[in-house]
Amino acid sequence: MAGHSKWANIKFRKGVQDAKRGKIFTKLIREITVAARMGGGDESSNPRLRDAVKKALNANMKRDTIDNAVKRGVGGADGEAMIAMRYEGYGPGGVAILVDCLSDNKNRTVSEVRHAFSKHGGNLGTDGSVSYLFTNQGEILMASNQPEDKVMEIAIDAGASDVAVEDSQIEIITPVEAYHTVLNALQDAGLEVEQSHLTMRAQTLVPISDETAESLIKLIDMLEDLDDVQEVYSNAEFSEKILESMN
């Protein structure tokens, strides 16, 4: 469990750094626009849009910018049509990697993703080559100073599949269909949620050496820096040394 939540923290810290460069804003606006185009502009009835807006607010995006992205999505006339794509491959050490993209040019995107894999000792696979190693689930992270018994009772009653305390966090895992029910139940009870998102969660983590980890992180960084890439998932288990170096 710890490997999942700690990597989520690494991604969160990197996200904050990206936000300072303005790079993450482009990806968030794109996700908001596509979510609104696909499911409408009402956050209460569009879970994908609700999650995208929450990510944008957490990255300190102005509400006006978010609203404009929603309007563009609902209007549907501005810009090129974005297509959701998922690429699968292997990184250094045979680590399984999923890459979720939104793009208006599939050829450009696959070329850039393939180049990143090749440059850092990985290779792009075929559809289904590694996706079976991951499960689509909800993940909710809370500070461990919250009342653990209360958190566990509310989360399980609302449909969570697992609750665990790791280091300074409480990690709650939910089926996709129960994600918003659990999240709302916790918030309605006055409990503070630090992070929450839908994710592709590795069923089993693969321990890797520190040397392999350095190469893998370079690959993941390069993938995440691509404009068309929205999310990168792996089944790597990092050592404490590597995790601490990411702080």
From Swiss-Prot:
> What highest taxon heads this organism's lineage?
Bacteria
GO CC, alphabetical: cytosol
BP terms from Gene Ontology: regulation of DNA-templated transcription
Record keywords, A-Z: Cytoplasm, DNA-binding, Transcription, Transcription regulation
What Pfam families does this protein map onto? TACO1_YebC_N, Transcrip_reg
Intracellular or extracellular location(s): Cytoplasm
Which molecular-function annotation in GO is an example for this chain?
A: DNA binding
Database matches in HAMAP family = Transcrip_reg_TACO1
Q: Tell me its family.
A: Belongs to the TACO1 family.
Q: What is this protein called?
A: Probable transcriptional regulatory protein lpp1249
Q: Which organism's genome codes for this protein? A: Legionella pneumophila (strain Paris)
